Amino acid sequence: MTSGGKVRIYELSRDLGLDNRDVLNAAEKLSIAAKSHSSSISDGEAAKIKALLNSNGKAAGGAKAPAKPDAGNQILSLKKAPSTPSQSAGAPASAPPSRKPEIVAKPAAPASPAKPAPSAPPSRKPEIVAKPAAPASPAKPAPSAPPSRKPEVVAKPAAPASPAKPAPKPVAKPVAKPASAPAPARPAQPLRPQASNRPPQQPSNRPPARPAAKPPVVMSKPTAPPPRPARPGAPAPRRDQNRPAVPMRPPNQQQRPSPQRSGPPRSGAPIRPGAPQRPGMPGRGGAPQQRRGPGGPGGRPPSSLELVGKPIRREPNAPQGRQGGAPSRPGGPGGMRKPVSPGELMQLQKPGSRPTPGDGPRRPPARPGSEAPRRPGEAPNRPNAPTAPPRRPGYRPAAAPGMAGRPRRPDWDDSARLDALRSRSPQKQRQKVHIIGENDDSLAAQTGGFAGGQEALVLQASLARPSKPKNLPGNKGARPVALRRRKKETTRQRQRRRAMELRQAREAKQIRPEMLVVPEGNLTVQELADKLSVESSEIIKSLFFKGIIATVTQTLDLESIEKVSQEFGVPVLQDDIEEAAKKTVEMIEESDLDHLIRRPPVVTVMGHVDHGKTSLLDAIRKTRVAAGEAGGITQHIGAYQVDVDHAGASKKVTFLDTPGHEAFTAMRARGTKVTDVAILVVAADDGVRPQTLEAISHARAAEVPIVVAINKVDKEGAQIDRVKQELSDQSLLAEDWGGDTVMVPVSALKGEGLDKLLEMILLVTEVEDLKANPERMAKGTVVEAHLDKAKGPVATLLVQNGTLRPGDVVAAGPVLGKVRAMVNDSGRRVKEAAPSSAVEVLGFSEVPAAGDEFEVYPDEKAARSVVGDRASEARATRLAQQMASRRVSLTSMSGQASEGELKELNLILKADVQGSVEAILGMLEQLPQGEVQVRVLLSAPGEVTETDVDLAAASGAVIVGFNTTLASGARRAAELAGVDVRDYNVIYKLLEDIQAAMEGLLEPELVESPLGEAEVRAVFSIGKSAVAGCYVTSGSIQRNCKIRVHRGKQLVFSGDLDSLKRMKNDVKEVNTGFECGFGCDRFADWQEGDRVEAFAMVTQRRTLAT
């Protein structure tokens, strides 16, 4: 009670034992303004609402007058007129006051026993069909049933009796008239009702809004063998016998719950199924389901009630009354269902299908979904397509007490919502079918009343079906939960798979490659990380420390790739170098197939520097080439032809000796490109080295067989098995270890194993079946080229097909020439060069490029046309290389220009052969050029001329010669012009001097040079200043040097030492063990115990930043 004589709606509903909505509906009818349960009304308005609700309750009670069972009728129905109010819950007419909550629906006529009434108004109420167990067994009354149960559901007893007789008209009459057995409609043995899983609720006094249009019809039908005999007078135990009746209350027509959404928890609002369950699945409380029990499939009773007809449109806010569970059929196991009181009456009607002997005339089954108008008293008949229990507008059964706070189930309201449920999911579509067990009185809670002028009462809450367990397959939420579980499992599996892939990738990345092959000279950061088997963050961090800001997708140039790879200990091999080893031109043409003969093999000796390649060839040729090489290393590619005795015959073998230094990669690639067999020389005491791996990659790119010569086996510390193991890691497994790679231990100095090595070479070449056509014009490759000061341009050519003769017109790349003379490796002139022969050719107009293919043309005109096109392409390539040699970007140029003049080192490079020029240029590109750029103005083989001197003088360049000489007059011109000319014969020294020249262009940097330390032992004040008396502990202290004063761990002063005295005399330096006085113009806060550190700033030459 609020202040000022006001009463809130929820207090009034609590006093009356009703739901808030009931009180709100009554207030709306009386035009009392009340919006919600917390609205306040006056005492007078509360009294009006109480009077209205009490009067409606008395009317409902009047409808509950006991009706005597008609002995001649098996099917009864209760219905009341629209003007008759419901009986009050507190004063039932004949039922015990607290025996059972009943929901009183508002029928169309006063209560009377159900009879065949042809004049019943048409309604869309479905029919409830009872399927008895025994054929033609009418229901008999239970003498011992409590008298308060007025309506009864008729079921067939076990003993055969007269069948139930339906109404004379098959469809027009809603009541089936039994043929005999004038007993009440209950079997002799009361059945145990299905216990409700929800507590009962207080009775509702809310009157119904409109009378029921027509009741459903229940028909008794035998469908299975007769059940066990019923025991009269033995009712099953009841749990809820003292519950008051619950009258019906009208629904609100403004709110309609969605079939897919449960309404808010309300008092007296039980859960109503939003969609019917499938047959055989246990339903929720109040849902008409098929019961499991003996005598039927799946444990269901042999007979059931079938709901026939289309659901009735419900009002939006109709409260959902509790659906009582149906009692089980006779003959079921004891204690399964509670007995149904005689006051609970339903109409029984036989379904139109499965006729049995003894049954009366049946109604024709209605078409599913048909909504045709019916005659008064006619009920729809759909025996084979049961649907949800219909609800008539204007009726809202109140729920049992204790249902407050329970979520409501949405009800079907119209066909549109039904279609939406049908199309929503297969689960909901299957839930439309109801298979109702025999004597299932839950339909009364949804239909409210029946035809015949009688009122049907709703079952007790204790008879309602319990909610379905969640683990059963029929649970409505089971399918969505399963779907969600599958999604989570899929996500979990995907995460597990990704974690496994990452773990496997991490394990695979533990092994780093022996060599990094860079395609097209660039890689992204992520690709570089994958090739190096490291995380991309490590690459980015390494680049950041080198002053390069990069992202994962940024492309790196070759220089940056080499820097990072060297940090991780992996050498870099450019893909274009490997491509240079591939054989791109086929020397054998189709016209040569008829003239092919066997040719000598071309064997290339490859391996790491100082592993004995040239010494091995010297041992084979019985020469001393290695002794005359500068620096003891090979810096040119050499071609030699050797006669080898094999099987009593002399055979020729052409050997190509390649340099082992890392600068001569292109030379090794060219040697591999023209070879037939690769000899891999590995020192037994050194094992596999970087250039060894490079040689292996070249041989595999050229697709040539590899013969391994394990050299220096006579040397102390030689480990042949270690070399074989390291080679097996590169997929080269020795024959004696079960592989297919020929490995021969040799000693070049002692000549051991050479015969076996030559024999293995010849055996391998025989398998290759090497052939050529000597009758055609020559075709081959330029192995090496240089400019001789006496002979002019000289090129070493390897003839691969045909025969080369003097006078032939040769086109080698963009260079045209005519063969004037040919010299073999022994220095003798030859008249012709057969296939697999290497000769030096004179007569070219200029030095050809090493590695170019040459071909002989029939006349000079044809050769000149080909050369002209190649010259244009070569010129464009050369210009592009010159522009790239500057390696200056706009960013670096602007950054360096802001600091001062751009520093460049201009070079003019002249070498003896083309291969040396390539090697030197390659090494210059590897020098760090972040601060000083190397600009090669001219690079060519040949001697230094006056023209080169003039170019160097004009551009301020340095002339670098490698294994070459100065032309006549060039040295004097250089002295006059002041041009620096350097000549080298070892590539190491050349690279060191060039790097030193680059560092010389850098500005020197100032660095600290420590001098000594002193300790303050006394402080003397002189005017406003102070002097520190110090003792030199180490080194020496010089006047005007830099000092730092430390007090403990704190730096208190850093500056110049202005005064240094000893015994009142100014001195320049004080050594260790002497005392002196310090004076500083800017510092006077001396304290005893201070430590003075003396140092000097000196200039130091800077080095190139790597």
From Swiss-Prot:
Its main location: cytoplasm. Residues 57-434, 466-497 are annotated as: Disordered. Residues 57-72, 81-97, 172-199, 251-292, 319-329, 395-405 have a biased composition (Low complexity). Residues 598-771 form the tr-type G domain. Residues 607-614 are annotated as: G1. GO terms for molecular function: GTP binding; GTPase activity; translation initiation factor activity. HAMAP family: IF_2_B. Residues 408-422 have a biased composition (Basic and acidic residues). Residues 711-714 are annotated as: G4. It is found in: Cytoplasm. One of the essential components for the initiation of protein synthesis. Protects formylmethionyl-tRNA from spontaneous hydrolysis and promotes its binding to the 30S ribosomal subunits. Also involved in the hydrolysis of GTP during the formation of the 70S ribosomal complex. Pfam families: EF-G_D2, GTP_EFTU, IF-2, IF2_N. Keywords: Cytoplasm, GTP-binding, Initiation factor, Nucleotide-binding, Protein biosynthesis. Residues 747-749 are annotated as: G5. Residues 482-497 have a biased composition (Basic residues). This is Translation initiation factor IF-2. GTP binds at residues 607-614, 657-661, 711-714. Belongs to the TRAFAC class translation factor GTPase superfamily. Classic translation factor GTPase family. IF-2 subfamily. Residues 632-636 are annotated as: G2. The keyword Transmembrane helix does not apply. It comes from Synechococcus sp. (strain RCC307). PANTHER family: TR-TYPE G DOMAIN-CONTAINING PROTEIN (PTHR43381:SF5), TRANSLATION INITIATION FACTOR IF-2-RELATED (PTHR43381). Residues 113-123, 138-148, 200-214, 223-235 have a biased composition (Pro residues). It comes from the Bacteria. Residues 657-660 are annotated as: G3. One of its GO terms (cellular component) is cytosol.
